[in-house]
């Protein structure tokens, strides 16, 4: 949950005050790409995410306690889909942001922003905890603050991009900044788009003469802001305007600089130009000098402001992809912007990566934070919903996997990594950043799959039948998509510890590898589409994330929860199973389950990044004959692509807490769950599987869960299943 600033920029106010937005132009006036009859519309992913965020905050104010991916996200995506498909002879080119700025260890974040209000902490998934009961005046301020906490995090953004890519093939991630990449698409030698739709900040970039700010498909019109009109109204050069727009931007992808000006005109008037620099650069230099003169008490804040200003100006130096050598270069090099004073982007976005890695990332289906960690030599945590002791413990437990994943990717580059830093999102500032040791090098094995028939559409449990085919990685190159994908899953499971083996030569006979205890537990899953959740369950148990202890989710004293421990246990185990929903959540909520989901998401994303790193290694090291341009097909198949939800945990909690709960009770309490009987069949099947899995991985050395609590929870679940009359055969369970 990232901190977010929503105040309007001075430039936005300037455009509004001077009525510089031309409204109601007919859609046929959208420019076509030269030599074609198509409008190639560059779509700014920053604006897409901003509009989705705003829609969720308005329509689902308590979203952070209901869904990981709120229902409004899908509604808004559908609105965009309808809008762009309604424009005749228009091909949208979606460009989303890639690697973000390097983290700032001095970033301010208050304790009150990642705790739960006591009124919300008291809601425990029962009838009295229904979201519809929180619409009174007492909750009005809570709704407002809670709504502002919602942001689209990386895993949800990845889901959004996957949906857009399934509808629009021209959907990519920029190496760094989407605005810079769209600017490069307007360069005379690399022109791929004829118009841009997005944020006003696009006017700061070369090659962009106007920005489409709104499209009304019903009326067949669009609104637009011309750079020429802005320059005329502001009486500025293009360089001055560009620097001003960036330095005072309030976009989520930029750093907020505190301004002491009443308007853009006031800023232009009062900033003293520094040695021929632009106004924006002069203001940044002014902040630099103020930081030098600042008192000890104010020096850190002044230094942060200076850094934010220079960081925003470095957007002009963002590397962009091109189809011609060198394939990736800073934007200001592409346009030949002379005398650019802050072109060194390395201090802000990290060291450059090999162009092939940017190309692999450009498909939009991989996590930019994985590549950012290699580039910036920093492992960055997400902002937690609640900064709890359990969250910190699990984060430390998962860290070795995350670090090993990063080094596996880094070792493929000619430039290795030294000691990297761990950047934690904790309330305690001194505890945020620490150095990490270089992990032991792990040589991943290969898999002799050429001698077997590998089917399509494999899931994690399916590849376990090939567990005995391990071989030296240098002895095998995969020939087909199926072999390559199976090898990616096997290598990932191997690094996670689901296989135990001694590598033998291909010519030697006998079994060289076999499933470990965790691998045999995974093989208990007879519904392959649920094997992803089986792995997640095992990893939650291995990291001791599944417990019955309450989370400290508020700074205020609240009445102790009276939820029995075995119900807490069952609801957390089953919270990872998704529900089919058809609308915004109005059912009961439980903030503790929302806090627990942060652990599930952390582990899920860590496994996902491992799979992504192995996929990248497979292609960048030439271990497959599958052409590089088909890597997107494999990326689409990778598991752990959908953000982990937690609504099922609330459903289980309600079901077990309500005496003799009936299907009608559940349908009334959870009206959004339109396939409830089917979801319950999946839920009870997975519970039976979870009991077997947790018992299988339990050893004297590894007490993953409280077996007494597991047994008690199992008895409750059996009674509930009998009372609801839910069948759990394989035919009834499909995902």
Swiss-Prot record:
One of its GO terms (molecular function) is 5'-flap endonuclease activity. GO terms for biological process: post-transcriptional regulation of gene expression; regulation of translation. It comes from the Eukaryota. Pfam families: MKT1_C, MKT1_N. Residues 475-722 are annotated as: Interaction with PBP1. One of its GO terms (cellular component) is cytoplasm. InterPro entries: MKT1_C, MKT1_N, PIN-like_dom_sf. Disruption phenotype: RNAI-mediated knockdown in the bloodstream form is lethal. RNAi-mediated knockdown in the procyclic form has no effect on viability. Belongs to the XPG/RAD2 endonuclease family. Forms a complex composed of at least MKT1, PBP1, XAC1 and LSM12. Within the complex, interacts (via C-terminus) with PBP1; the interaction is direct. Interacts with RNA-binding protein ZC3H11 (via MKT1-binding motif); the interaction is direct. May interact with RNA-binding proteins CFB1 and CFB2. Interacts with the EIF4E6-EIF4G5 translation initiation complex via EIF4G5; the interaction with EIF4G5 is direct. Involved in post-transcriptional regulation of gene expression. Promotes mRNA stabilization by recruiting a complex containing PBP1, LSM12 and XAC1 to mRNAs. Recruited to mRNAs by sequence-specific RNA binding proteins. May regulate translation through interactions with the EIF4E6-EIF4G5 translation initiation complex. This is Post-transcriptional regulator MKT1. It comes from Trypanosoma brucei brucei (strain 927/4 GUTat10.1).
């Amino acid at each position: 949950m990232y901190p977010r600033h929503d105040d309007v920029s001075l430039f936005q106010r300037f455009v509004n005050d001077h009525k510089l937005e031309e409204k109601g132009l007919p859609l046929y006036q959208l420019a076509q790409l030269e030599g074609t009859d198509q409008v190639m519309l560059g779509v700014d992913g920053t604006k897409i995410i901003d509009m989705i965020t705003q829609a969720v905050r308005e329509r689902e104010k308590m979203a952070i306690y209901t869904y990981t991916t709120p229902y409004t996200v899908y509604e808004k995506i559908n609105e965009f889909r309808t809008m762009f498909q309604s424009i005749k002879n228009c091909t949208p080119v979606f460009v989303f942001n890639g690697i973000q700025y390097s983290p700032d260890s001095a970033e301010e974040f208050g304790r009150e922003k990642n705790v739960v209000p006591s009124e919300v902490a008291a809601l425990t998934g029962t009838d009295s905890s229904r979201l519809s009961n929180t619409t009174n005046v007492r909750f009005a301020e809570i709704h407002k603050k809670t709504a502002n906490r919602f942001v689209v995090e990386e895993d949800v953004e990845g889901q959004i991009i996957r949906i857009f890519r399934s509808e629009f093939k021209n959907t990519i991630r920029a190496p760094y900044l989407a605005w810079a990449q769209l600017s490069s698409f307007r360069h005379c030698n690399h022109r791929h788009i004829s118009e841009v739709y997005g944020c006003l900040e696009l006017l700061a970039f070369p090659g962009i003469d106007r920005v489409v700010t709104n499209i009304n498909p019903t009326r067949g019109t669009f609104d637009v802001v011309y750079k020429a009109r802005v320059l005329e109204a502001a009486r500025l050069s293009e360089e001055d305007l560009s620097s001003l727009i960036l330095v005072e931007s309030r976009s989520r992808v930029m750093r907020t600089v505190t301004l002491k000006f009443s308007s853009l005109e006031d800023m232009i008037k009062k900033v003293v130009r520094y040695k021929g620099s632009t106004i924006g650069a002069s203001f940044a230099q002014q902040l630099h000098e103020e930081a030098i003169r600042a008192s000890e008490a104010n020096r850190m804040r002044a230094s942060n402001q200076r850094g934010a200003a220079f960081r925003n100006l470095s957007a002009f130096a963002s590397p962009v992809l091109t189809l011609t050598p060198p394939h990736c270069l800073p934007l200001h090099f592409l346009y030949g912007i002379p005398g650019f004073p802050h072109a060194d982007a390395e201090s802000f976005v990290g060291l450059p990566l090999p162009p092939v890695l940017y190309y692999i990332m450009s498909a939009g289906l991989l996590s930019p934070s994985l590549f950012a960690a290699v580039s910036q030599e920093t492992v960055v945590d997400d902002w937690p919903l609640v900064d709890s002791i359990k969250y910190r413990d699990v984060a430390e437990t998962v860290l070795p996997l995350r670090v090993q994943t990063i080094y596996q990717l880094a070792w493929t580059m000619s430039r290795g990594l030294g000691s990297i830093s761990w950047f934690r999102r904790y309330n305690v500032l001194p505890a945020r950043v620490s150095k990490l040791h270089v992990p032991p090098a792990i040589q991943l094995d290969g898999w002799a799959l050429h001698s077997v028939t590998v089917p399509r559409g494999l899931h994690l449990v399916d590849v376990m039948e090939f567990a005995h085919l391990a071989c030296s990685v240098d002895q095998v190159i995969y020939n087909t998509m199926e072999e390559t994908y199976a090898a990616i899953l096997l290598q990932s499971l191997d690094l996670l510890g689901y296989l135990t083996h001694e590598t033998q030569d291909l010519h030697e006979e006998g079994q060289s590898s076999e499933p470990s205890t965790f691998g045999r537990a995974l093989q208990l899953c007879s519904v392959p589409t649920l094997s992803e959740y089986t792995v997640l369950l095992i990893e939650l148990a291995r990291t001791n994330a599944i417990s019955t202890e309450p989370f400290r989710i508020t700074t205020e004293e609240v009445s102790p929860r009276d939820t029995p421990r075995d119900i807490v246990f069952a609801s957390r185990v089953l919270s990872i199973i998704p529900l089919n929903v058809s609308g915004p959540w109005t059912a009961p909520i439980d903030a503790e389950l929302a806090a627990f989901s942060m652990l599930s998401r952390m582990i899920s994303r860590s496994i996902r990044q491992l799979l992504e790193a192995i996929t990248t290694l497979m292609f960048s090291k030439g271990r497959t004959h599958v052409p590089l341009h088909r890597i997107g097909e494999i990326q689409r198949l990778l598991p752990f692509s959908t953000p982990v939800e937690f609504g099922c945990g609330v459903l289980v909690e309600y079901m077990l807490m309500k005496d003799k709960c009936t299907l009608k009770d559940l349908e009334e309490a959870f009206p959004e769950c339109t396939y409830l009987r089917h979801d319950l069949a999946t839920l009870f099947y997975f519970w039976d599987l979870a009991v077997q899995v947790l018992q299988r991985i339990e050893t004297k050395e590894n007490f993953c869960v409280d077996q007494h609590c597991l047994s008690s929870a199992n008895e409750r679940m059996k009674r509930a299943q009998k009372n609801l009359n839910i069948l759990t055969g394989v035919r009834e369970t499909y995902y």
